[in-house]
Structure formats: structure tokens, C-alpha cells
């Protein structure tokens, strides 16, 4: 059952799906009118979702199962896949092919050794596409890495997700897809990895030859922010997935196909979500 208002779906009892089979969960009839959430319609994201991290209850959403390109938010899925197969202290040396990529980049130097942890910090904090390429090679090459990422997506319940590049870069014939629902599921699963949760909260990290600074502005703008990942490509437009905690409650927010101030909308979504019973 579903009630919509100008494209807005309030799903006060809906649950995020975490199984790998079966239909998407039904959205229960809300027990309040959607007028309380009308202000959320003014946000710049075409599709979005805010949900309780611990119960999986979707508090509000617009087009939560609409498929969009994820851009760099797919790096959260890559991070989980990496930690399923590689130890944080394992290392490899960068080569020229890792750096031949459209940036954003952390600035890998061919011949320099990097640990798995350093590369995870690079993809989660500064969205390094070069680091994503290197991690894919450490997993056995891009075809192997992408197959592992897509298996991981299915395993955690993100059944509408397909990664076609480890970094989120896209183009004709290699478009990645996901949904707001799936990104919320992926983020919830990722924050169960202590190292991912720690990295996403770091303001800075030491990287060979430099200090890198986390690009997630909500770390400083929103009290209780637990971390987040931005993304942008021409196909995806602006994307964001993040989480925050207030008291004992944790929420996850997803925004897809956006323009303008996604951080401002994320703050409104989180504030509204924390105000709900």
C-alpha cells in the first residue's frame, strides 16, 4: 500500500530489504498525512530516501526504486568488496595504468607502494578514481573486481545494483545503475565494517607524500554525522549517501540525480527524520 503526494512517498512502516530473493517490500499505509514532509519536495534530488539505519524502516522517500547512475557512491560497495578479500595492511605498487583515468584522483605515483587501507582512505575520503582502479587490480583485475562487487550487492540485498566500473565512472556501454533503496542498503551494510566506519568519520588521513582531507562537508556541518560519499558524472548528476546519529538513533539518507545544494537537502531530510517517532 502506498500514498503519494506530488511524487513523494511516505513509508512510515516500510522496511529496507536485506534478502537476496523475493519481491521488494510493500510500503505500508502511513499513519499521518504527508503535509509534514511537503518542504522536502523543494530539494534538488530527483530521487531520495531517508531511513532508520538500525530497524530498516523507511521514513520517507521519493522514487526509492528508480534506477539511476550512482557515480562515486558505488565506491562504498567497492570498499566492502575489498575488505572481504584483502587485508588492510596488504600492499602493492601503483603503475601507469592506474593513473590513466578521468579524475577526481588522489594522485598515485607509479612505482610507489600503497596499502589497502591507504587506498580505501583515498576512495572514501577524496573519491580517488586512480585508487579505485588500483584496488580493482589488487582484487584480480577489473572484470574480477566488478563480478565480486555485483555479487556483494546481491548478497546484502541491493538487487537493483550493477557496477560497471570500480570508480563509478560511466559512459556508453558501461553504465552502472543503482537505486536510492539499494544505496541505503549498501551504506547500512558498509558501516558494519569497523574500518569503513572509521575512515568515513576521519577528517584527515596521512597518505604517501601528502595529507588528504575528507570531502564530505556534513562531517563539519551536521552534528552526529557518521560519514558519507558524494558522486558526480554527467549521467548521474549529483549523488550522495550518508548517515548520522542523534542520541541512540541512526539514519541513512540517499539522494540521486540531483543538482544544486544536496548537502542542504540532506540536512533537511535528516532533521525531519530525527523528528519522527
Outline where the language-model segments fall.
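Hydrophobic alpha-helical segments, especially transmembrane helices
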Residues: 3-4, 76, 246, 250
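Secretory targeting and sorting signals
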Residues: 1-28
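Active-site-adjacent loops and short helices of periplasmic peptidoglycan-processing enzymes
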Residues: 26-181, 188-191
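Penicillin-recognizing serine hydrolase domain
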Residues: 31-46, 141-277
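Hydrophobic alpha-helical transmembrane segments of integral membrane proteins
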Residues: 4-6, 72, 224
Amino acid at each position: 500500500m502506498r500514498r503519494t503526494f506530488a511524487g513523494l512517498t511516505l513509508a512510515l512502516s516500510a522496511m529496507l530489504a536485506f534478502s537476496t530473493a523475493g519481491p521488494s517490500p510493500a510500503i505500508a499505509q502511513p499513519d499521518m498525512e504527508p503535509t509534514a514532509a511537503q518542504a522536502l519536495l523543494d530539494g534538488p534530488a530527483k530521487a531520495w530516501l531517508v531511513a532508520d539505519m538500525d530497524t530498516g524502516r523507511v521514513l520517507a522517500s521519493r522514487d526509492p526504486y528508480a534506477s539511476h547512475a550512482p557515480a562515486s557512491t558505488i565506491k562504498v560497495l567497492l570498499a566492502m568488496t575489498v575488505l572481504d578479500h584483502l587485508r588492510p595492511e596488504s600492499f602493492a605498487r601503483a603503475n601507469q595504468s592506474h593513473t590513466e583515468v578521468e579524475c577526481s584522483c588522489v594522485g598515485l605515483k607509479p612505482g610507489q607502494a600503497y596499502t589497502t587501507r591507504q587506498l580505501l582512505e583515498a576512495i572514501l575520503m577524496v573519491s580517488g578514481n586512480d585508487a579505485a582502479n588500483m584496488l580493482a587490480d589488487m582484487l584480480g583485475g577489473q572484470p574480477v573486481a566488478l563480478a565480486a562487487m555485483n555479487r556483494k550487492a546481491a548478497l546484502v540485498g541491493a538487487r537493483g545494483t550493477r557496477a560497471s566500473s570500480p570508480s563509478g565512472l560511466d559512459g556508453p556501454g558501461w553504465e552502472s545503475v543503482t537505486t536510492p533503496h539499494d544505496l541505503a542498503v549498501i551504506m547500512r551494510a558498509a558501516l558494519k565494517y569497523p574500518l569503513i566506519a572509521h575512515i568515513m568519520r576521519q577528517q584527515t588521513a596521512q597518505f604517501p607524500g601528502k595529507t588528504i582531507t575528507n570531502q564530505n562537508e556534513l562531517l563539519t556541518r551536521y552534528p552526529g554525522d557518521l560519514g558519507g560519499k558524494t558522486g558526480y558524472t554527467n549521467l548521474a548528476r549529483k549523488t550522495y549517501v550518508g548517515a548520522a546519529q542523534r542520541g541512540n538513533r541512526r539514519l541513512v539518507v540517499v539522494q540521486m540525480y540531483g543538482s544544486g545544494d544536496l548537502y542542504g537537502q540532506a540536512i533537511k531530510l535528516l532533521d525531519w527524520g530525527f523528528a519522527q517517532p
